């Protein structure tokens, strides 16, 4: 028998729309999920891996279940029920995720377990239901085996196209405009509306519309009033971060401190509310060493803005002819610094909103490059993780070209001097020593060798020129900072590689630090 394959099977528009928008909602759910987990467990590679892995596994289970059920009962009413249940589950996720994440955080599991259980409990149910949609739609659209390939192909393409739209809408638009809970409520509303397309009975359509209106109204109310049980303080979402601004008291002196938090395990920036230009964090004071090693320092590059504590301090304490270029990835953080951390416009301050490595790459190939007197680096993707692309031999080459021969590169690293928590520091030290002839180490928190295995801020000062690493008569202003210098011979661990663009296992070494702590 010869089949006529010239006839193109017409797929009902309602099924095409269901396939398209269910794919978009799935990707929005995944992107928004990362923002909901971030305040509790960070945004490290481990968290992303767990989230993507669990959602993909759930979709796989949903595809299998949906196909099996559709073969036994290819009924549009059943697909409508699946969509309604998915909408309700997504709405429940929006309202109760903070309760669940807070409870999981209280169990003090390691990051692997916390990330997996968070994704499993919060996102697996809705992902399984959404995964059931595609095979169910394909079965409803399929009338005979002759056209099965074309039907499945077109519906798969529509689902993928929806996923693409959801990815760009979620990443470029929604997350920067709305809180995570609002996005999930809107997603739930869309899924509820899809059920209207597949239901045939009038009363079922009315029920679906009622659920849609309830969820849509919930999204609006959520935007106005916020979700219950959010972490304390002001909560903000940007394109790159979930930010918390809280206030506390510095136990050392009883003064009020405003704190910017981008990771649950560490603070990003601190500011005294009664004197914003004064530095709070001990490690930030070590950037002053640039003026010790090069007293005529005027032009400074800072990679990583955060709360702009260091630029604010330098603009207040240095002469009028100083100039500071700050490279900060997240424009939202800069706006928070303006709104909450006393960052003012200043003709001596220039801000670049881009990835620090792309800035270095562009400057590296600029024939009219104007070198800097000092470069400060304070960049983190989570509590202790420096972006790997800023820790490598290739990065050091670019930094060296941007820095004057007698200028100082000052890098903040969170690690230990020796032991299992030292991997990040040793890898960066090896990578940077290829380009800088002078490398000086300043344990900012505990300089005594007995604390060599303690996790702390380690300040690495690198210079292109060979200079005396010990100043015989330091200015009194710098004496305390210089007393932290590590003067014992330092030998990097031979088991730790010099980080390169091709291989920089920063996440693995940082995870060891967290697990040991």
What residue ranges belong to the model's regions?
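Alpha-helical transmembrane segments of multi-pass membrane proteins
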Residues: 1-236, 247-256, 262-268, 295-298, ...
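SAM/dcSAM-binding transferase cores
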Residues: 241-244, 453-517
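Conserved SAM-binding loop and adjacent beta-strand
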Residues: 272-284
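Hydrophobic alpha-helical membrane-association signature
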Residues: 283, 391, 395, 428, ...
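Short alpha-helix immediately C-terminal to the canonical SAM-binding loop
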Residues: 334-335
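Glycine-rich phosphate-binding loop and adjoining beta1-alpha1-beta2 segment
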Residues: 340-344
């Amino acid at each position: 028998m010869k089949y006529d394959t010239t006839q193109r099977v017409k797929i009902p528009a309602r099924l095409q729309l269901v396939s398209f928008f269910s794919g978009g909602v799935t990707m929005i759910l995944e992107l928004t999920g990362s923002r909901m987990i971030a305040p509790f467990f960070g945004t490290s590679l481990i968290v992303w891996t767990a989230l993507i892995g669990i959602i993909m596994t759930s979709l796989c289970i949903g595809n299998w279940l949906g196909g099996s059920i559709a073969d036994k009962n290819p009924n549009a009413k059943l697909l409508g029920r699946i969509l309604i249940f998915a909408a309700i589950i997504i709405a429940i996720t929006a309202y109760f995720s903070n309760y669940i994440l807070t409870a999981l955080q209280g169990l003090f599991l390691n990051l692997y377990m916390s990330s997996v259980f968070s994704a499993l409990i919060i996102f697996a149910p809705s992902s399984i239901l959404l995964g059931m949609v595609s095979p169910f739609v394909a079965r409803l659209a399929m009338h005979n085996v002759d056209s099965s390939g074309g039907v499945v192909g077109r519906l798969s393409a529509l689902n993928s196209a929806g996923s693409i739209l959801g990815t760009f809408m979620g990443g470029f638009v929604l997350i920067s405009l709305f809180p995570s809970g609002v996005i999930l409520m809107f997603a739930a509303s869309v899924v509820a509306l899809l059920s209207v397309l597949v239901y045939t009975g009038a009363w079922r359509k009315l029920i679906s519309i009622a659920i849609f209106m309830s969820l849509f109204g919930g999204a609006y109310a959520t935007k106005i009033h916020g979700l219950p049980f959010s972490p304390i303080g002001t909560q903000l979402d940007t394109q790159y971060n979930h930010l918390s601004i809280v206030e506390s008291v510095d136990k050392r002196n009883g003064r009020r401190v405003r704190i910017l938090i981008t990771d649950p395990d560490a603070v990003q920036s601190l500011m005294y509310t009664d004197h914003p230009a004064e530095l709070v964090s001990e490690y930030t004071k070590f950037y002053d060493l640039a003026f010790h090693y090069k007293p005529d320092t005027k032009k400074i590059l800072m990679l990583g803005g955060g709360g702009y504590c260091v630029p604010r301090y330098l603009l207040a304490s240095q002469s009028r002819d100083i100039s500071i270029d700050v490279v900060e990835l997240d424009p939202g953080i800069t706006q928070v610094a303006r709104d909450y951390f006393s960052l003012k416009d200043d003709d001596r301050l220039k801000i670049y909103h881009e990835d620090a490595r792309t800035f270095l790459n562009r400057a590296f190939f600029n024939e009219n490059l104007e070198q800097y007197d000092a470069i400060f680096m304070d960049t983190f993707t989570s509590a202790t993780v420096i972006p790997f692309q800023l820790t490598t031999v290739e990065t050091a080459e670019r930094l060296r070209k941007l820095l004057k021969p007698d200028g100082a590169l000052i890098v903040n690293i969170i690690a230990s001097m020796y032991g299992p928590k030292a991997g990040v520091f040793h890898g960066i030290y090896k990578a940077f020593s290829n380009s800088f002839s002078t490398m000086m180490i300043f344990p900012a928190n505990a300089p005594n060798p007995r604390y060599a295995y303690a996790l702390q801020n380690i300040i690495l000062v690198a210079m292109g020129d060979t200079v005396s690493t010990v100043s015989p008569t330091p200015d009194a202003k710098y004496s305390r900072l210089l007393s932290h210098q590590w003067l014992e011979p330092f030998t990097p661990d031979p088991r730790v590689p010099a980080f390169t663009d091709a291989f920089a296992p920063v996440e693995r070494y940082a995870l060891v630090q967290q697990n040991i702590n």
